[in-house]
Curated annotation (Swiss-Prot):
PANTHER family: PROTEIN GVPL 2. This strain probably produces some gas vesicles from the probable gvpO-gvpA-gvpF-gvpG-gvpJ-gvpL-gvpS-gvpK operon; it can be induced to produce more under certain growth conditions. Its main location: other. This is Gas vesicle protein L. It comes from Streptomyces sp. (strain CB03234). One of its GO terms (cellular component) is gas vesicle. The keyword Transmembrane helix does not apply.
């Protein structure tokens, strides 16, 4: 690409009344704009070719700090858009050469975009994570060796056995709660998907993540969904609810489809 400015596409939506909320800013602080083509609207923003042309973008995507900033700006636009319409979020760094490229992207992906928007209309995404937390027994097992030596060998072994049984009980309770909760939430939701558990070493969140799921829920049933999550409780188990979000996990367009459509728009 040779132009200094490219068009970053945040999302696709249907035409809607009103405007984007004031103060909505995307990549580089650039306010997003709406580009209508037929029965679809692309939400775009100008970005520098020096960062988003194909070669520099590959390098930028290896920079975790830059990537995190871009993801936050991307999500800010989607969140603002969600207050006025139902958006179909596109993947991070979907870039076209110019407005003509954006129009080609809408044309080439038209049927997939329409199907996905029909599926998402009136629905939001909720995230649910379940963690098995180290209980007091496990902490007891990890007492300093000096303290362990103060007790007899029999007492020490008894304490370790009790800690192990307690820890196994935590895992069993967490597993049972995950199965029960996922079944109940799936009945309340239009769709659900289970993601790979988070690594505590990377997330910094205490406990072991045993369920990392997302659910597509009608707005009208969101209160019922939240109450189901709030009612889930077991000793040694923590349940975390996030949302409501724009339905990233249920965009309904495979990564390869988005990539092909993106390439057509360049």
């Amino acid at each position: 690409m040779s132009t200094d400015r490219l068009q970053y596409v945040y999302a696709v939506t249907r035409p809607f009344d009103g405007v984007l909320p004031e103060g909505a800013h995307g990549i580089g602080g650039e306010p997003p704009r709406l580009l209508r083509h037929g029965d679809l609207v692309a939400v775009t923003g100008a970005v520098p070719a020096g960062d988003f042309d194909e070669a520099p973008l590959r390098a930028r995507l290896e920079d975790l700090d830059w990537l995190a900033d871009a993801a936050r700006a991307h999500d800010a636009v989607i969140s603002a858009l969600s207050t006025v319409t139902c958006p179909l979020p596109l993947r991070l760094a979907t870039v076209c050469r110019d407005d003509s490229g954006v129009r080609r992207l809408l044309e080439d992906g038209h049927d997939r975009f329409v199907r996905a928007l029909e599926r998402l209309d009136g629905r939001v995404e909720w995230g649910v994570k379940v963690y098995a937390e180290p209980g007091a027994a496990q902490q007891q097992e990890e007492e300093p060796a000096a303290h362990a030596r103060e007790a007899s060998g029999r007492d020490y072994l008894r304490r370790r056995l009790h800690a192990r049984r307690s820890r196994d009980g935590d895992w069993q309770r967490a597993d049972a709660l995950c199965r029960r909760l996922h079944t109940e939430l799936s009945r309340c939701a239009e769709a659900g998907t289970v993601h790979r558990p988070q690594d505590a070493r990377l997330s910094g969140v205490p406990g072991v993540n045993v369920l990392n799921a997302a659910y597509l829920v009608d707005r009208a049933r969101s209160q019922q969904f939240v109450e189901l999550v709030d009612g889930a409780s077991e000793p040694g188990v923590r349940v975390e609810l996030t949302g409501p979000w724009a339905p990233y996990s249920f965009a309904g367009i495979a990564e390869e489809d988005v990539h092909e459509t993106q390439e057509a728009g360049r």
